[in-house]
Swiss-Prot record:
Catalytic activity: (E)-4-coumarate + ATP + CoA = (E)-4-coumaroyl-CoA + AMP + diphosphate; (E)-4-coumarate + ATP + H(+) = (E)-4-coumaroyl-AMP + diphosphate; (E)-4-coumaroyl-AMP + CoA = (E)-4-coumaroyl-CoA + AMP + H(+)
Upper taxonomic lineage: Eukaryota, Viridiplantae, Streptophyta, Embryophyta, Tracheophyta
Binding positions ((E)-4-coumaroyl-AMP): 253, 323, 345-346, 350, 448, 452
The keyword Nucleotide-binding is annotated on this UniProt entry: yes
Protein name listed in UniProt: 4-coumarate--CoA ligase-like 1
Enzyme class, spelled out: ligase
Keyword Ligase among record annotations: yes
Domain characteristics, as noted in the entry: Both substrate-binding domains (SBD1 and SBD2) are involved in the substrate recognition, and are sufficient to confer the substrate specificity.
Length: 552
């Protein structure tokens, strides 16, 4: 039974926390696609800059040009590449102007965009392609060697077809993007029947249960998240803002919270292909960037960078951070260095299209370090006791559960994981947290055992599976270890077979060949056994506690 309501926290007598923000209704038209909503902006501000590459002399598109590019690309994908409603199209590329153009073109056809990390190995990419059932790859020539074994048609966003051909079988189908869209007219676009409830994207996340799974996100999920993310700007009647996007567009935050949400409002997106702190500051200066979403290591770099004074960063008025809490000392240093900027933290996950809560300091709330802000409009939450599932009032820690129009439909082709995560309409995040008396959400721990390296999630189960595939390894466990720059790094405790002469370097190289750089083991320790319960479950938290207290 729920306790008495606490209106100041948004906590009702039914045990549900509701947003303290004004309502931000989602478009009611069931036939509205995310691309439809986006392209309305071309009618409202056709000559305003929509997208631009961060580097000097890079490509740029106005909203009118964005509309033309999206629809022309959609026509070409349909008529020349055979993309049909429901087909999955894989995007494998760094951030660039053409990345969102292609994603929006895919969704304009009623097809499904599935994104993948360019740092993935061929094995990891092939696994996702197989699971998503992708029929086409959009990429750049430098990444073609990673997909050479897939035998799928390839569209190259750059013009280096010769380099790409050298890595592909002789009978491979390779088309330059410029050739694909040559002579195509946006007027030839014929919109297929698309509903808000149709799948728009399949983004892969380790989620709440470990192994990577395809998160099914609909047009409605993107539309709802866009309203949630931008409603504060609307309430303050802000003019168009300029957002720098260096967080990867293959990730839900870069794709949904930054790129789609801000474009739908009429804000400009500056696409940065690779993060470098000096390049970031140059881009802020060159494009007069107003809004910067970061992860904690970048915030720390900004706070400590000795050359920040060389650049004119006065245009910045908003610095947002997610993925992990910012320490009070870091927040204070950044606030001093950027006195005219709001320093804001938020919380979200792929399964919620990137957003759950966000700080809004201007609302007069007392600033609480470690808070991820209040629920965005339209999201409801409950905190449940992990043993009894009882709803908990403010200032009591339990599992964070949420529901709202931004919540995923489930995991692709994985009923078991879906039923484990979504129960009676509530998404169980796997995170422990609480709301204070003012409705601010604090995330204090993780039920799930993911390792957070900067903005990336690493599933220990994946690395453990690879370790156990080695013929000389009998048992293994992977846990997070604190790191000042990355937040957490993966380390392993390994049980060797009796006659093995494996070294730490041997194990690290074995893993390095099979995973993206951020999943590489930073340390390997050989032990006689892995601590487990009577039922055989790894006592991971016990091991983490021992390691951090230097007892192991």
């Amino acid at each position: 039974m729920a306790s008495a309501s606490v209106p100041a926290a948004g906590y009702g007598a039914d045990g549900v926390y509701r947003s303290l923000r004004p309502p931000a209704p989602v478009a009611s038209d069931p036939g509205l696609s995310l691309t439809d909503l986006l392209l309305r902006r071309a009618d409202a501000c056709p000559s305003a800059v929509a997208l631009a590459d961060a580097a000097a002399g890079g490509r740029a598109l106005t909203f009118a040009e964005l509309r033309s590019a999206v629809l022309s690309t959609a026509v070409a994908l349909s008529s020349r590449a055979g993309v049909r409603p429901g087909d999955a199209v894989l995007l494998l590329a760094p951030n660039c102007v053409l990345y969102p153009v292609c994603f929006f073109a895919v969704t304009a056809l009623g097809a499904v965009g599935t994104t993948v990390n360019p740092d993935y190995t061929p094995r990891e990419i092939a696994k996702q392609v197989s699971d998503a059932r992708a029929k086409l790859v959009i990429t750049i020539s430098a990444l073609v060697p990673k997909i050479a074994g897939l035998r799928l048609p390839v569209i190259l966003l750059d013009d280096d077809a010769n380099a790409a051909a050298a890595s592909l079988p002789p009978d491979a189908t390779v088309t330059l993007y410029t050739n694909l869209v040559a002579g195509v007219k946006e007027a030839d676009y014929r919109r297929p029947p698309i509903k808000q409830s149709d799948t728009a994207a399949l983004l892969y996340s380790s989620g709440t249960t470990g192994d990577s799974k395809g998160v099914i996100l609909t047009h409605r999920n993107f539309i709802a998240a866009a309203r949630m993310v931008t409603s504060d700007q609307d309430e303050r009647r802000e003019g168009p803002n300029v957002f720098l996007c260096f967080l990867p567009m293959f990730h839900i935050f870069g794709l949904s919270v930054i790129t789609y949400a801000q474009l739908h409002r009429g804000n400009a997106i500056i696409a940065m292909s690779r993060f470098d702190i000096n390049s970031l500051m140059e881009a802020v200066q060159r494009h007069r960037v107003t809004h910067l979403f970061c992860v904690p290591p970048v915030i720390i770099a900004l706070a400590k960078h000795g050359k920040a004074g060389k650049y004119d960063l006065s245009s910045l008025k908003f610095i947002g951070s997610g993925a992990a809490p910012l320490g009070k000392d870091v927040m204070e240093v950044v606030a001093k260095k950027f006195p005219d900027s709001e320093i804001v933290q938020g919380y979200g996950m792929t399964e919620t299209c990137g957003i759950i809560s966000l700080e809004y300091p201007e609302k007069g709330q007392a600033r609480e370090f470690g808070s991820t802000g209040t629920l965005v409009s339209g999201v409801e939450a409950k905190i449940v006791d992990i043993k009894t599932l009882k709803h908990l009032p403010p200032n009591q820690v339990g599992e964070i559960c949420v529901r709202g129009p931004n919540v995923m439909q489930g995991y692709f082709n994985n009923v078991q994981a879906t039923e484990f995560t979504i129960k009676q309409g509530w998404l169980h995040t796997g995170d422990l947290g609480y709301f204070d008396g003012g409705g601010q959400l604090f995330v204090v721990d993780r039920l799930k055992e993911l390792i957070k390296y900067k903005g990336f999630q690493i599933a220990p189960a994946e690395l453990e599976g690879l370790l156990l595939s080695h013929p000389e390894i009998l048992d293994a466990v992977v846990i997070p270890f604190p790191d000042a720059k990355a937040g957490e790094v993966p380390i392993a405790y390994v049980v060797r077979s009796p006659d093995s002469s494996l070294t730490e370097v041997d194990v690290q190289k074995f893993i390095e060949k099979q995973v993206a750089y951020y999943k590489r083991l930073k340390r390997v320790t050989f032990v006689g056994s892995v601590p487990k319960s009577a039922s055989g479950k790894i006592l991971r938290r016990q091991l983490i506690a021992q390691v951090r207290s230097s007892k192991l």
